[in-house]
């Protein structure tokens, strides 16, 4: 359905697009589409553009994002190793809300979306919403076989009086900022570089689940974070800062399996 999260509405799935139109069909939108894994500096550059357009034209800002990532979807159906992601999807939603986006539209990447041609995506998704400004990344592709590109969207926009632009490549130290570069940095434990590319320290959250409570037997509190069907790009033992209800606590994190107790499930 539609959920209000700290002044940002989350629309979950195309099946709720008609409900969304009933509630917000009177609004005009400044929008973007992408995966936005990590919400790094390049993504923030796009979000700044749609927020500026929304403020100038009295539009509402809207971000379409897909879950799972296409590479995760194909890895799951082929039983391959799941590719790592920078942050869980709930963290992504939280970051979009904190960044001041008005609406986040979650598109489930499933067989139906996978088979949708670029023209069908435009008709079934974009034309259902009163978009007046659309900004995409310079490498954005969409639709079946990734056949849709900026030129197709630009031609569509011109025919509908919709301004469609592609962001310029956002670079750091001469290299294009990308989720791939950040994953590589995290896998090499280069947290300083990853933080620069993200524009903030690398963080993640997860649901605390009960373990074997072995730490409690020796006076050391522990917490197991469950990461459902998601692989983070970091593995090993790290010194960390934990945020517990607003209180920061120093701690140690074991990322991956629990080797000391023969664990086989990633935590």
What are these regions (language model features)?
Residues 44-129:
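Core alpha/beta nucleotide-donor-binding catalytic domains of modification enzymes
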Residues 32, 61-65, 166:
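Structural beta-sheet core signal
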Residues 32-50:
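Di-metal (Zn2+ and/or Mg2+/Mn2+) metal-binding site signature of metallo-dependent hydrolases
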Residues 5-33:
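Positively charged, low-complexity intrinsically disordered leader regions
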Residues 40, 96, 134, 194, ...:
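Residue-level signal for inorganic ion chemistry
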């Amino acid at each position: 359905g539609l959920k209000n999260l700290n002044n940002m509405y989350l629309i979950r799935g195309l099946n709720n697009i008609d409900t969304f139109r009933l509630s917000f069909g009177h609004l005009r939108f400044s929008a973007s589409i992408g995966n936005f894994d990590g919400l790094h500096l390049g993504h923030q550059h796009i979000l700044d553009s749609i927020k500026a357009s929304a403020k100038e034209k009295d539009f509402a800002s809207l971000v379409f994002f897909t879950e799972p990532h296409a590479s995760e979807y194909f890895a799951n159906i082929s039983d391959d190793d799941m590719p790592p992601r920078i942050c869980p999807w709930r963290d992504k939603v939280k970051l979009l809300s904190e960044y001041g986006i008005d609406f986040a539209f979650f598109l489930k990447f499933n067989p139906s979306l996978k088979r949708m041609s670029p023209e069908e995506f435009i008709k079934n998704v974009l034309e259902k919403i009163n978009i007046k400004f659309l900004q995409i990344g310079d490498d954005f592709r969409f639709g079946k076989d990734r056949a849709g590109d900026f030129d197709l969207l630009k031609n569509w926009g011109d025919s509908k009086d919709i301004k469609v632009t592609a962001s310029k490549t956002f670079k750091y130290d001469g290299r294009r900022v990308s989720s791939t570069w950040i994953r590589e940095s995290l896998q090499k434990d280069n947290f300083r570089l990853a933080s620069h590319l993200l524009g903030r320290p690398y963080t993640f959250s997860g649901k605390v689940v009960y373990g074997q409570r072995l730490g409690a037997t020796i006076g050391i509190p522990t917490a197991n974070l469950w990461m459902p069907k998601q692989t983070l790009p970091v593995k090993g033992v790290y010194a960390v800062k934990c945020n517990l209800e607003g209180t920061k606590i120093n701690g140690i994190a074991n990322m991956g399996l629990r080797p000391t107790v023969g664990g086989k499930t990633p935590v």
